[in-house]
Amino acid sequence: MKTLVVYYSKTGNARKVAGIVINELDGCDSSELLFDEKANTIEGAKDPSGFDRVIMVCPIWAFSLSTPMKLYLKQYGGAIQNYSLIVTCGGLGLSGCVRNCVKATGKQPLGAMKIRNKQLRADNFDIKPML
């Protein structure tokens, strides 16, 4: 299965999780989204149309996907065949993120997972079900 890991990280938490996913999925492709806040644009986005599955990793912002991931989905959501979502956060917001993804892709995720910041700091999480 050809997999693309797409991630955005402002503080490094989502980047850490994406790195673990990439290491576990030896041979997958990855794309780090670079966000220009002033222009509200992203760079570094790869077209997901040639991939069987996309794993998206990003922080939750205000009970929703981070703006860079929303921009990615606005541009490429229709090209995503199958996807999983992993979000990092301080608390709540997974259901809002899933709604964002379903709206952009027209599909339910294969899986969705929230990793709280305290779990991340303690390395107390298991991403294997998302792989």
Q: What do these predicted ranges mean?
A:
Residues 96-106:
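Short, aromatic/basic amphipathic alpha-helical patches
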Residues 1-75, 124-131:
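N-terminal beta1-alpha1-beta2 submodule of the flavodoxin-like/Rossmannoid cofactor-binding fold
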Residues 21, 25-26, 79, 104-108:
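Short, structured coil segments at secondary-structure junctions
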Residues 63-93:
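Mid-chain, well-packed structural core segment of small domains
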Residues 110-131:
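Glycine-rich phosphate/pyrophosphate-binding loop and the adjoining helix
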Residues 13, 61, 90-93, 119:
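Glycine-/small-residue-rich active-site loops that bind phosphorylated ligands and cofactors
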Residues 28-32, 108-115:
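Short beta-strand elements in bilobed, periplasmic/extracellular small-molecule ligand-binding domains
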